[in-house]
Amino acid sequence: MAKTAAVPLAPGVWRIPLIGDYVNGFMLRDEDDQVTLIDMGIGSSGAKVMAALRSIGSGASDVTRLMLTHCHPDHAGGAAHVSRETGRPVDIHTDDAEYVRTGTQPDVDPTSRIGKLFRKLPDPKMEKVNVGEELTDGQVVPFAGGIRVVHTPGHSPGHASFLLEESGVLITGDAIFNVLGRRWPLKMLCSNFAMTKKTAQRLGELEYSTAAFTHGPEIRENPREEIRRFLAKAG
């Protein structure tokens, strides 16, 4: 298997390109060499996550926490593999927890014509995963200086962005994409597209020095201004 390169974002923070820059996971390592993994890509990406872990000199036994921005299969699909490898359950916002437990998906936006078609199709297959902690808005997970949970529902009911308070990295999740520029997730893949656009405004109110996306490369130069400009124009 080809080595999965980890992209440094800040001291102790890496982006894992799982399908090029189009689908990303993240690794955090604290001063005690413990590791938190955030988002594990599609079903076949679990092995890539573990390879990226080894590429920074860590292993399965160093992982103390798995976290998901939301329940969709391009983020949670690889979680079962990584959970087995590390022996850890996944932590996810309480409004998405049951979908991960049952391997199911939330309904898509009924105002989308293609979304209406999707509602008639069976859920994409995704392995069930044990859930550890059900996260809530405003909660600060005690790891590497604090991971603040920012509930940004709409793309899914329990979608959350994560602010790494010590390193100044914002992980947007799918609240905003950075594929060929900033853009919204596709309406047909959202549970409530209008809510997606409304709750993403919260990301313009936060302080951070790097904006990292689960879809697309990071923004290192004036990220908050870039996010606020997008929100003002597209919101």
Indicate residue ranges for each PLM-predicted region.
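Metallo-beta-lactamase
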Residues: 8-9, 42-44, 96-153, 157-233
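Residue-level marker for buried hydrophobic side chains located in beta-strands
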Residues: 36-38, 67, 90, 169-171, ...
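Short, well-ordered secondary-structure micro-motifs
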Residues: 26, 102-104, 223-224
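Conserved beta-strand hairpin/beta-sheet module of binuclear metal-dependent hydrolase folds
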Residues: 3-56, 161-173
